[in-house]
Amino acid sequence: MKKIISLFLILLFISCSNTQSEWMMLFDGSSVKGLRGYKMDTFPWESWAISDGSLKTVPGKNGVDIITNEIFEDFELELEWKLQSGGNSGIFYFATKDGDFIWQSAPEMQVLDNISHRDGLRD
């Protein structure tokens, strides 16, 4: 099964609408307050790092999915991402604690290098 590092590079602009119709930034470029590892109580620093205002995966480490502490029902997600050549990642949403892996309970917005990845576009 392909390895997916989910929630890849939650960068600069991520926001959700709360019940008071105010916008809430989930990542401010310097703090992971409000984020944690999937099925964890803390943030997985062994798999993620903050660098130059971006949240990045740590190369060579097993990917640990990150989620918000707060549960959202309606939201608008805006983000920027970078993906290495041949990369395969994604953004999961509406995840639950069901299953051992996040992809067992949540739909995914795929982030894939369609040109270079083996699962990408083909002639």
State where each predicted segment sits.
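Sec-dependent N-terminal signal peptides
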Residues: I4-I14
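Carbohydrate-interacting regions of secretory-pathway proteins
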Residues: C16-D123
